[in-house]
Amino acid sequence: MKPIAVITGASSGIGAATARLLAEHGFHVVAVARREDRLNQLSAEDENIETLTIDVTSDTDVQKLAAHLQGKPVEILVCNAGGAFDFDTVITSDPEVWMKTYDVNVVGSVRCIKALTPLMTKHGKGHLVIITSTAGQVAYENGGSYVAAKHGEVALARTLRLELSGLPIRVTEIAPGMVKTDEFALTRFSGDSERAAKIYAGVEKPLTDSDVAEAIRWSVMLPEHFNIDSMTIRPVAQAAQHKVHRITQQ
């Protein structure tokens, strides 16, 4: 049986691109997300992509995923489910949004890692890939809930690497900078397409979801003794979180 790669948040964007790429490179992909219609479209593309409708904020759903994978060669878990849900200052923000952001990004990853790491240990090898963000390396205005959550995921990856020392399980954190996907900015701005478009305005070549998928593929296909602790990837136009070269229209 082919080695299994489980990818969360796989109905669109980075998750869907990663599912396609790993399926092309010899993995049996179990793609999980909440939106069944999107998952059905994904599984129709490749017989090596299996899908399950799973909400990572649900203990019951994640246990269902673990039960489905019992006795199977689970080697890769890509914790990609996440998102930003506001662009408010700390003072004007809604604490419920902070709770949601932390649950989806951090606790959702914890649930999946707790459920699937024992399967990797039993199989004899595994690789946990946590998709964070450059927002986990710095702070910026109006991004408190997301910045806090991504810092939490960075801490999660570093802690896991220490706690799993001695086991044949790799832990990699991949921190993308500016990635232009169909949904991230739209979700952050509650569907306001004009505000979302301004994020990428004038940036000649932001990263794409396929670029991040390639970084994930590269890291998981390295020799098994080789661990990438963390990887930061940005478009050339983004020198730092706050420094983005934009081409202005004349």
Predicted region positions:
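Conserved glycine-rich cofactor-binding loop
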Residues: S11-S12
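Conserved glycine-rich Rossmann-like NAD(P)H-binding loop of the short-chain dehydrogenase/reductase
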Residues: H25-N40
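Active-site helix of classical SDR
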Residues: I113, A149
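Alpha-helical segment proximal to the catalytic Tyr-Lys
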Residues: P118, L162-S165
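Residue(s) in the substrate-gating loop at a strand-loop-helix junction
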Residues: S133
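C-terminal helical subdomain
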Residues: E173-I174, S193-H242
